Amino acid sequence: MTGNILIKPSVQQKFDSVMQSGRILFFSAPCGFGKTALANALLCGHRTLRLCADAPDFTLRTLPENWDVLLIDDFQLLQEQETSQTLCELIRANPTRRFVFLSRGVPPSYLTAFQYTGLMTTLEPDDLLFDREDIRGFFAARKAAVTESEINGILKESIGYPLGGAVTARCMSGGKPFAPEIVAQAYREVFSYFEDAIYRRFDLPVRHFLLDLAPFERFDLEMARMVSGDPRTGNLLDWLLHNTTMLRYDDVRHFHFWPQFRAFLLWEMEKECSEEKRRAVFSRGALYYELKEDYAHALECYTKSGDHAKISELLIRNSELHPGMGHYSEMEKYYRALPESEILASPSLMQGMSMLCALAMDYEGSERWYGALKDFADCRKKQDPAARQARSRLAWLDISLPQRGVEGLIKTIPAVFRLLTDKEITLPSFSVTSTLPSIMNGGKDFSEWSKKDDLLYRTLRTPVEAVLKKDGVGLADCAVAESKFEKGENITKRILALIPQVSEIQQKGTPDIEFAVNGLLARCQLAKGQAADARRTIETLRARFEAQGLTRFLPNMDAMLCRMALHCDDPDSADEWYRTKAPRDPMHLNVMKRYQYLTQAMVEIEQSRPDAALLTLSPLERYIQGCGRHIDGIHLNILCAL
């Protein structure tokens, strides 16, 4: 702490390194990060020439001689090529002098060479954010007493933003406790500062562009163009990226606003935009998500736009997607908000409600909606397209509903196969794995079939592949291999025969079956003591799935990697998964996460926390019993016994 200025040790270290062996220290952060005050504190005792790029008489051509450090504030305003060339010549001609640049933008390309050679160090926003210790020291320097819980609250609300912390400290002067009124006052002051120091300095097209994008946490160029309707979208994004640090890259194609600035933009939007304007923005965003088949975000935006007709339309379309993708639980609130009369008029919505109730373990409600769908089909002529659709949905539910078990499937699947062959029904897609690394214990528990797996393989393979379509590619061979593995048989030859089918699964099948095949391979490798190979199998698949946007599989892949860590006596990796990715919400059971719940309990047992493990496992018992999940039941009973 220098005076009232907090200098983080990491910042001081980088400054000292530049003074000793570097040339340039570049501050790249939004306003309110204390760049000017911090630079002045660091440069105390150095002969410093201070210039401001927005000064009318700014020039680099004629500089006095008595300086060791040149500081240029508002560096982002240096746009002229002649000035940049002069600056580079000045830096190269003065190897014993140092340069400190304060910018709201990113380092310009003409300074890249200095960065690559290690002569330029950049301080970014994350380098300047306050952490818990910084906040404690900041308040202590102002002789303001704060409790640990208040420090946590200040850090949460300010996200470490220095101006937010400073304003909060001033608002709490005189011994005022940290309370919602203090938070509201601090936000108002910070937002007013943003309005004057940043927002009002932008041209009107930039302001409108920012407000159009503010409601969306993440966007790409295509979405920005569709939402704003501005043909210069690419140029505007490029200008914001180079002249501010308010817009950040998520990856090569996606962007997001710095969180505090986005909160300000939403505040500004409430003030400046009419209700009609805000609804129009959400409607355009919803259309983008709809075209990308991101129905969860589309429904959220259509709800905010007030377009209730589109909500019903999207839910009907969404019912084509299987629950293994998790869409039913994501959209539950939209289904529940529909009038019952509207649901009863749509076979798709009745199917969706039946499955939704089943996933919520409301089996009575699930069967009620199944009955309503059956009544819908029965009261119409057989040739009626609506009746045909209803029969198709009923056949889908007969196979998919978790409470139905597998006992009747030996008769159901051939019957459905005949209906398909006779073109009496068409089936939506299925989920045979529920994004789990297993077929035997995926969407349903097929352990009963293991007793006669060879017979069922011969008799049911053709109808199963026809009924399941893409999900049937590679399914039968993977399922029978997994059945043999679960019975303790050596399946090396079966695995060797299965692996060549992966390319066909990738081309003609589904990622669900590909994950099941890789999951079985990894379990075999683990059983043979090849832990490193098993981990590589899943990590390689995970990286490819993530690159392809198949994010629905990642949570169970991470849980599987955690189990491998436990198997290999790697508690640190298991603890990391537990802290950052475990569900850890026993009061809200999501049966689609059952693999993760069991993994969570394993980690809790490894941590010598049996009570926590029992609390995690307890909600699963009703689901396991109600849906005949024998394999999950064995795992649960073993974990409870431990």
Go through each PLM region and give its residues.
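Walker A/P-loop nucleotide-binding motif
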Residues: 22-39
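Alpha-helical sensor/transducer elements of the RecA-like P-loop NTPase core
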Residues: 11, 37, 85-153, 157, ...
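C-terminal boundary/linker of central alpha/beta nucleotide-binding cores
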Residues: 149, 191-271, 280
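Conserved P-loop NTPase "ATPase switch" module shared by AAA+ and STAND
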Residues: 63-83
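Amphipathic alpha-helical "lid/sensor" segments that cap RecA-like P-loop NTPase cores
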Residues: 32, 39, 116, 121-122, ...
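Extended alpha-helical scaffolding segments used for macromolecular assembly and cargo binding
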Residues: 275-349, 356, 365-369
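Residue register of alpha-helical TPR repeats
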Residues: 212, 280, 313, 348, ...
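Internal alpha-solenoid helical repeat scaffolds
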Residues: 342-517, 524
